[in-house]
């Protein structure tokens, strides 16, 4: 029997949204005898958690509901979460050693564009890096992607997009056929 491919998938949570639903549907359609999957969530929460197949190992950085207010009683937990995640982003070796227990992956996959840097900054240089882009990055409200920021996505081995418009945006910025 062939050795299972080890895959790490990163996403913020499984709270709601199209990307989260697409990811869970994708996981349900993978053959469990071919893949060993670790799904790393920043926040263990969401309506799609119950739909994750049993063969997927769900890991998380924080547990509980997303804190969307600045109520006084919520600030310490919110601050801890932000600082903890920032430390792990700045020092990814800590994440891979202590949360992922030194596991080596064949593939590291950003299920949404917001995890671009986390995957590209992985200490596991030999893994294939994939990203799934679900949004028109020229219109995102959370981040202003300059051409330079956009070009960082070409650090991935494979960029998967959900529309022709997004594909065209990347092709315009591609500097050679390999990037296209």
Q: Which residues does each PLM region occupy?
A:
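Extreme N-terminal starter segment of soluble prokaryotic enzymes
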Residues: 2-8
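Membrane-proximal helix-turn-helix segments that form the acceptor-binding/catalytic region
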Residues: 94-104, 142-161
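An aromatic- and histidine-rich active-site surface loop
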Residues: 88-101, 105-126
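A short, active-site helix/loop in glycosyltransferases that binds the activated sugar's phosphate group
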Residues: 117-120, 156-180
């Amino acid at each position: 029997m062939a050795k299972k491919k080890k895959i790490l998938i990163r996403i913020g949570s499984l709270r709601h949204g199209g990307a989260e639903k697409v990811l869970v549907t994708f996981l349900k359609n993978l053959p469990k005898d071919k893949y060993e999957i670790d799904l790393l969530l920043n926040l263990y929460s969401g309506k799609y958690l119950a739909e994750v197949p049993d063969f997927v190992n769900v890991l998380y950085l924080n547990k509980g509901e997303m804190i969307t207010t600045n109520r006084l009683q919520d600030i310490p937990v919110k601050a801890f979460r932000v600082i903890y995640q920032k430390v792990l982003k700045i020092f990814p070796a800590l994440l891979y050693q202590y949360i992922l227990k030194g596991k080596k992956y064949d593939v590291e996959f950003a299920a949404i564009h917001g995890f671009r840097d986390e995957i590209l900054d992985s200490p596991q240089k030999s893994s294939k890096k994939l990203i799934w882009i679900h949004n028109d990055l020229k219109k995102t409200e959370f981040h202003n992607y300059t051409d330079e920021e956009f070009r960082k996505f070409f650090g991935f081995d494979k960029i998967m997009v959900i529309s022709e418009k997004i594909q065209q945006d990347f092709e315009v910025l591609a500097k050679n056929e390999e990037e296209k």
